[in-house]
Amino acid sequence: MQQKTIKLGNLEIANDKPFTLFGGMNVLESRDMAMAVCEKYVEVTNKLGVPYVFKASFDKANRSSIHSYRGPGMEEGLKIFQELKDTFGVKIITDVHEIYQCKPVAEVVDIIQLPAFLARQTDLVEAMARTGAVINVKKPQFLSPGQMGNIVEKIEECGNDQVILCDRGTNFGYDNLVVDMLGFSVMKQVSKGCPVIFDVTHSLQCRDPFGAASSGRRAQVTELARAGLAVGIAGLFLEAHPDPNNAKCDGPSALPLSTLEAFVGQMKAIDDLVKSFPEIDTSK
């Protein structure tokens, strides 16, 4: 099966090309922290020769608790994103939750993200598609990989074929997630070769049924990321934080920023090895 390539300037995102790191922080906590985190990612990815897209949310609209930090909002968030682009020359991905956000966000960032909880909301999907921007679709935790083809079709019916699919884990009973690596290939097939990326940090979430925030399994981020890249995919979606224990959102799943270079170095080695192998047709 031929793999589709998404081109963003000099970036080429595809399942059969060197992996792209979609990395940053969960939510914009401040302008200064965003600058520091982005600078570290740029330093590491430039040193290791890894294609890079900065990620962060300006509004976490689906927090568990009404009291949880959501972010600076769209207006302030877009100002920060523009400064990051001007300063570091990075491509940026962020999520939208409302139809009115689609056009102004797509005018600043390079990839707009359809959140997992909203991935079947047709009006939102259509509004995003009509911007013409590249769209990253998060697979809902409650949806099988095969059903992602229907979401891709909605986007393509609006005249937009610039689609990336992202796995962020699947419900395993109550308050737990697992990752089905076989689903990566299924998503490639039902989308006719769309790039598939793996959100390793969100896949490590654990829900506290009586708490106001998610827990996580940060200690397992390296082994899960290794397994995901071993399948042969287009990219890795990763959140890192200078002080994960005091992060305003999903700290228990975030990689300590100080370990970023060692982590990305391992991931590049695995991706290079896997993609050096010839494909073996075992379907006959």
From Swiss-Prot:
Reactions mediated catalytically: D-arabinose 5-phosphate + phosphoenolpyruvate + H2O = 3-deoxy-alpha-D-manno-2-octulosonate-8-phosphate + phosphate
Entry keyword set: Cytoplasm, Lipopolysaccharide biosynthesis, Transferase
Pathway: Carbohydrate biosynthesis; 3-deoxy-D-manno-octulosonate biosynthesis; 3-deoxy-D-manno-octulosonate from D-ribulose 5-phosphate: step 2/3; Bacterial outer membrane biogenesis; lipopolysaccharide biosynthesis
EC numbers, comma separated: 2.5.1.55
Cellular localization per UniProt: Cytoplasm
SUPFAM superfamilies reported for this sequence: Aldolase
Cited HAMAP family: KDO8P_synth
PANTHER family in the record: PHOSPHO-2-DEHYDRO-3-DEOXYHEPTONATE ALDOLASE
Family (UniProt): Belongs to the KdsA family.
NCBIfam families: KDO8P_synth, PRK05198.1, PRK12457.1
Protein name: 2-dehydro-3-deoxyphosphooctonate aldolase
